[in-house]
């Protein structure tokens, strides 16, 4: 039996809505030939399956085993053609590609004038929506046609096309360079996490500024600014400069708020910008502004003119619920947060083919933290085990580390003393494999190791000593992020004061919100 996720045709069919399936069958009906009925039979069979099973297909004798591969490829292609014809999938890029195809067909038939007319309209549409890669492709085809279709205005036309091609090429090279830089920074973040020391910081900073082009930001168009800000956001996250990440993510979102027509043209970038802004607001502990940003994003995505497709639906879920959880951790409303867990687990199942394992595991970690916050340590452990037992998981080392540490603390709180020693051993073995450990992680593990030797009447003082030791790292540039993954200080305060961790965090959030916050300059 082939895994569902590896059988692309099966996954594609399962992703279709009822209307898309209906349209596909109508599309096949218009084709009408006996050979086509085979792939429709295969479509209907796969649509009814809960899991992909090749043997069931062969038992139906739709085709022989040798023919099945070709039939699946043919069906896959026909589904994509049907989807392309669906008005729901007609975004700007698809429309432009369609017009370019039409112009190419007319050119091949020698109908140069008609081809140029279509290209001129398509080019205007591409430039209005900052689709400059497509615009460049259109100009290149215009140049090819003009070289064969001689007119009296050729001289002026040549100068215009050459100027447009040069300008678009320059803009596209800049965007390509900045997108490469962003991708390299993102890869560094996923593989190794955030900078851990001055050496890391110098290495990343040297790389970033060596790669960063010297430009005047005011001279950049919308798309070029977008990539420029994105690269700076990733650099700021990597170097843990949270005010800088707030600054550039704010500029990113403000661009869309100023040019709202770009939201419809580039909805993914709109969502990502808001997500990075909210992550920055979490890092600088600004819950009031965070709520405003989350509410504005939720309102925007429900508007009629916001594009609708499966990719956007999964991203909207990812960014909305991930940030709802972040808000809960900032405010300490853990019991209220439990209400969203059924929604999250249901949507994780619905979007399983759209979300990568890394993001799914982050949800599991945050759900575990929710249960930890309401003293439900057994459920906390259940979700942590989903991460720990996933041996094929490619996840950030720092998150995997705190998953292990939280598991040790949860086992201690749950009273699973018989598991605690094994947990500590496994955690130590895992941490030894890591390149660099934070001092916060070292201190927590040292404390947990000697817990069994501490008498009950000495516990409170031991918690106070650890709290004092960890507090020294709270404002350390490289250590402070550790407290975001695992609010160990609030846990220690709850043990010292005999109060729930939710009470402690809620009290801190109220103090934060009562503080007079001056607007943070982003210029």
Residue map of PLM features:
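Active-site/pore-lining binding-face segments in mid-to-C-terminal subdomains
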Residues: 389-458
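Helix-turn-helix repeat elements of alpha-solenoid scaffolds
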Residues: 73-77, 110-120, 151-162, 195-212, ...
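Amphipathic alpha-helical segments of tetratricopeptide repeats
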Residues: 120-128, 162-170, 205-217, 250-262, ...
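Flexible inter-repeat linkers and adjacent short helices
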Residues: 1-207, 217-219, 455-523
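Alpha-solenoid helical repeat architecture
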Residues: 130-137, 172-179, 219-226, 261-272, ...
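"A position-specific structural signal for the A-helix of alpha-solenoid helical repeats
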Residues: 97, 101-105, 134-137, 141, ...
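Alpha-solenoid helical-repeat scaffolds
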Residues: 175-292
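Alpha-helical linker/edge segments of TPR/alpha-solenoid repeat scaffolds
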Residues: 143-158, 164, 168-172, 183-190, ...
């Amino acid at each position: 039996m082939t895994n569902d996720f590896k059988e692309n045709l099966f996954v594609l069919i399962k992703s279709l809505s009822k209307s898309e399936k209906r349209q596909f069958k109508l599309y096949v009906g218009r084709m009408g030939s006996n050979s086509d009925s085979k792939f429709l039979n295969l479509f209907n069979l796969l649509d009814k399956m809960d899991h992909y099973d090749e043997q069931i297909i062969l038992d139906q004798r739709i085709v022989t085993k040798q023919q099945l591969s070709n039939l699946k490829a043919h069906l896959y292609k026909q589904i994509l053609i049907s989807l392309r014809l669906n008005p729901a999938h007609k975004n700007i890029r698809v429309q432009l590609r369609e017009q370019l195809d039409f112009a190419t067909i007319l050119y091949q038939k020698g109908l140069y004038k008609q081809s140029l007319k279509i290209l001129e309209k398509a080019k205007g549409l591409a430039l209005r929506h900052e689709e400059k890669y497509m615009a460049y492709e259109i100009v290149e085809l215009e140049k090819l046609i003009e070289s064969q279709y001689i007119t009296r205005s050729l001289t002026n036309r040549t100068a215009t096309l050459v100027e447009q091609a040069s300008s678009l090429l320059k803009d596209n090279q800049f965007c390509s360079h900045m997108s490469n830089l962003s991708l390299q920074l993102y890869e560094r973040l996923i593989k190794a996490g955030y900078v851990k020391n001055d050496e890391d910081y110098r290495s990343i900073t040297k790389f970033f500024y060596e790669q960063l082009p010297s430009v005047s930001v005011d001279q950049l168009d919308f798309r070029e600014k977008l990539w420029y800000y994105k690269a700076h956001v990733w650099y700021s996250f990597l170097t843990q400069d949270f005010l800088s990440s707030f600054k550039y993510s704010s500029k990113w979102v403000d661009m869309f708020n100023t040019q709202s027509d770009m939201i419809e043209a580039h909805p993914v970038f709109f969502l990502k910008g808001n997500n990075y802004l909210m992550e920055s607001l979490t890092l600088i502990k600004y819950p009031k502004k965070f709520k405003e940003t989350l509410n504005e994003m939720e309102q925007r995505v429900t508007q009629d003119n916001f594009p609708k497709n499966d990719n956007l639906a999964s991203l909207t879920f990812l960014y909305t619920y991930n940030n709802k959880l972040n808000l809960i951790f900032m405010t300490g409303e853990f019991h209220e947060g439990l209400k969203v867990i059924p929604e999250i687990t249901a949507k994780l199942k619905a979007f399983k083919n759209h979300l990568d394992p890394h993001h799914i595991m982050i949800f599991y970690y945050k759900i575990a933290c929710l249960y930890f916050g309401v003293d439900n340590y057994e459920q906390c452990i259940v979700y942590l085990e989903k991460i720990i037992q996933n041996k094929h998981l490619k996840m950030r080392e720092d998150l995997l580390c705190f998953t292990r540490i939280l598991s040790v603390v949860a086992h201690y709180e749950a009273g699973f003393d018989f598991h605690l020693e094994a947990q500590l051993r496994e955690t130590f073995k895992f941490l030894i494999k890591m390149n660099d450990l934070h001092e916060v992680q070292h201190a927590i593990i040292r404390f947990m190791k000697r817990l069994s030797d501490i008498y009950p009447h000495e516990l409170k003082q031991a918690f106070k000593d650890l709290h004092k030791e960890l507090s020294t790292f709270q404002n350390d540039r490289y250590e402070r992020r550790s407290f975001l993954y695992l609010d160990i200080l609030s846990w220690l305060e709850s043990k010292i004061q005999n109060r729930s961790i939710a009470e402690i965090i809620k009290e801190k959030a109220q103090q934060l919100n009562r503080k007079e916050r001056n607007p943070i300059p982003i210029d």
